[in-house]
Amino acid sequence: MDADDSRAPKGSLRKFLEHLSGAGKAIGVLTSGGDAQGMNAAVRAVVRMGIYVGAKVCFIYEGYQGMVDGGSNIAEADWESVSSILQVGGTIIGSARCQAFRTREGRLKAACNLLQRGITNLCVIGGDGSLTGANLFRKEWSGLLEELARNGQIDKEAVQKYAYLNVVGMVGSIDNDFCGTDMTIGTDSALHRIIEVVDAIMTTAQSHQRTFVLEVMGRHCGYLALVSALACGADWVFLPESPPEEGWEEQMCVKLSENRARKKRLNIIIVAEGAIDTQNKPITSEKIKELVVTQLGYDTRVTILGHVQRGGTPSAFDRILASRMGVEAVIALLEATPDTPACVVSLNGNHAVRLPLMECVQMTQDVQKAMDERRFQDAVRLRGRSFAGNLNTYKRLAIKLPDDQIPKTNCNVAVINVGAPAAGMNAAVRSAVRVGIADGHRMLAIYDGFDGFAKGQIKEIGWTDVGGWTGQGGSILGTKRVLPGKYLEEIATQMRTHSINALLIIGGFEAYLGLLELSAAREKHEEFCVPMVMVPATVSNNVPGSDFSIGADTALNTITDTCDRIKQSASGTKRRVFIIETMGGYCGYLANMGGLAAGADAAYIFEEPFDIRDLQSSVEHLTEKMKTTIQRGLVLRNESCSENYTTDFIYQLYSEEGKGVFDCRKNVLGHMQQGGAPSPFDRNFGTKISARAMEWITAKLKETRGRGKKFTTDDSVCVLGISKRNVIFQPVAELKKQTDFEHRIPKEQWWLKLRPLMKILAKYKASYDVSDSGQLEHVQPWSV
């Protein structure tokens, strides 16, 4: 599918939420199967969006069991009943495995209970089993109604009035085992738990020179194991979809001993709980420990993470994902017709899509069938593009071929960090260095940005030099905001001295400006006529050409965690409003998305101009809120959203206007947003996007092999980014037109579309464009 195949219609054809009404409709929301962090955010979004459009929304407690039992298990929800649940793990409405719903009698009871409350729209949050059950229920619905009418439990009018059941699913599962969706609700939070444990284990393992075998959950899906192995640079990983080849025991022991010989003091082996060999026999953690102890004599420990992975606070990513999906689910139910198949709302790249539920379920079952029949390549293919990409990247970075097996290109590729530090930069450098070495290049590290480049702070960097960099925050190479413009002569001299054939720049808006300056200097300095590519890395997420930047997710999690603590403080004090200032320069990404993830009442950003009337409206909104049971407020403000409406001004205005109703406090989060260990998302995004950048450089250098060609075309100076569903290389010359240089932001930003969501979920009226919604797509199998 192309990135553009669901563009919003133009002009009068645009469709807004106001055009959809839920009046007279009743929506039932339930969570079923294993719990997952973020389910509460989804429940909150469904309830609030449902109420916003005028529908009645009911909680169905304890999953399908509550639907079968009826009575107090089905209760109407109101706005306040989903307050303060965003930051809570698990599901507040409970989940239970239900045998009764598997029988027709059970489903008959469930139908009767729903009809008593007029519910003909179901929003099911759960795994493939729960969603398959919902689809069967929908198919049987008319038959169940007729049976209830024959039994005298409902009249003929009710059969006609409630003739159709609409079902929309959201996949809540930490395993990420549902085909058709890139990320299921809960997966990112589970990765956070795993990486927290791995980071903690690494310190003790290094102290004692130990080997740790970590078993992670995921049933028959290796996603958690694979991505956590990628995020922590594990020595070996065992997956159900890609079993190790015959003789793996010896290969693994050789790999572990080689790593020890390179002065690595610890080994990490990650095992998926469903790991198997090529004969479909289980590979257990204990078996691996036994092997390492007997063959190598290493001090080895096994850690089984278990249900820790299901627990804890949802990550910012899961809260935003679940909120987006919950809103999309309500819109899908409002737009459903009797002919619409049951669908799943999901994420494809950065794009919300609807997919036919049974197509997804079928493909998910096909993966298991392929594994049972030992067609492992098919299993990886069916898991999708993201899974296959992660697997290939892991293999490239984990296993170093002997030097004599790597064909040398005689090319020197330099890596530089530019701008402010961002968590994940080191993961990106590690990935670039290792992929470059595997491709036969000589890799050079430039220290301290363009300043260091001009001074000749350049050294060769090897495979082992970047070991253990993935989990390190900040920038090990050192980074500065200095632009190359005033050092062009010196930098050209260094390019010539070190025979640099290509340049990879990892950084923020300064890196983008630097790339433009180097590109413009090509006519004067032929040394710059080499392939140059930039990978966006900044907490501000303000680089043109990419929807995401390395470091923004970690900053968002820092903001979200801090807001959770502040909200807790405000809840204890009662009648208190907090004003939080976030970073980002003129870019409101952190304030807006932080507001969505933390459940803020307002977020002031530069991209949406505001005046004193808007501030007054916010005060009135908070005054009304204090009359309810939720007696606290949270307001986010981007640091450069307004020259005059500063954080101090807003604090003073709120303090004065709120006198006698609420008091006010302010917090400036500052540079804590740039620090800390990178989140799993930033580690993996940095790792994968940097590997892609090096593949591009290698392909460009192959064009010139032996010919000494100079690169002068625009397509040899690019920014690599994610746009909607695709990873794309865009020439900086083209991106100039899309850039607001004065305010250092792109002219168009995708996340502004989500701005109304934050307002709606905070009880403001807002105009939400739903033109992109409504296209039911088909699941596309991907070929490896």
UniProtKB/Swiss-Prot annotation:
Reactions mediated catalytically: beta-D-fructose 6-phosphate + ATP = beta-D-fructose 1,6-bisphosphate + ADP + H(+)
N-acetylmethionine modifications at: M1
Region of interest: C-terminal regulatory PFK domain 2: 412-784
Interdomain linker: annotated segments: 400-411
This enzyme's EC code(s): 2.7.1.11
N-terminal catalytic PFK domain 1: annotated span: 1-399
Sequence positions that bind beta-D-fructose 2,6-bisphosphate: 481, 538-542, 576, 583-585, 639, 665, 671-674, 744
Binding site for ATP: G34, R97, C98, G127, D128, G129, S130
Any one Gene Ontology molecular-function term assigned to this protein's record: fructose-6-phosphate binding
Subcellular location: Cytoplasm
Binding sites annotated in the UniProt record for Mg(2+): D128
Modified residues (N6-acetyllysine): K395, K486, K688
Residue list for modification Phosphotyrosine: Y651
Recorded superkingdom: Eukaryota
Cofactor(s) required, per the database record: Mg(2+)
Record-listed substrate binding positions: S173, I174, D175, R210, M217, G218, R219, E273, R301, H307, V308, Q309, R310
Record-listed Phosphoserine modification sites: S6, S12, S21, S142, S386, S783
Glycan-bearing residues: S540
PANTHER family: ATP-DEPENDENT 6-PHOSPHOFRUCTOKINASE, PLATELET TYPE (PTHR13697:SF5), PHOSPHOFRUCTOKINASE (PTHR13697)
Protein family membership: Belongs to the phosphofructokinase type A (PFKA) family. ATP-dependent PFK group I subfamily. Eukaryotic two domain clade 'E' sub-subfamily.
Self-association state and partner proteins as the record states: Homo- and heterotetramers. Phosphofructokinase (PFK) enzyme functions as a tetramer composed of different combinations of 3 types of subunits, called PFKM (M), PFKL (L) and PFKP (P). The composition of the PFK tetramer differs according to the tissue type it is present in. The kinetic and regulatory properties of the tetrameric enzyme are dependent on the subunit composition, hence can vary across tissues. Interacts with ATG4B; promoting phosphorylation of ATG4B.
Reported function: Catalyzes the phosphorylation of D-fructose 6-phosphate to fructose 1,6-bisphosphate by ATP, the first committing step of glycolysis.
Protein name as it appears in the record: ATP-dependent 6-phosphofructokinase, platelet type
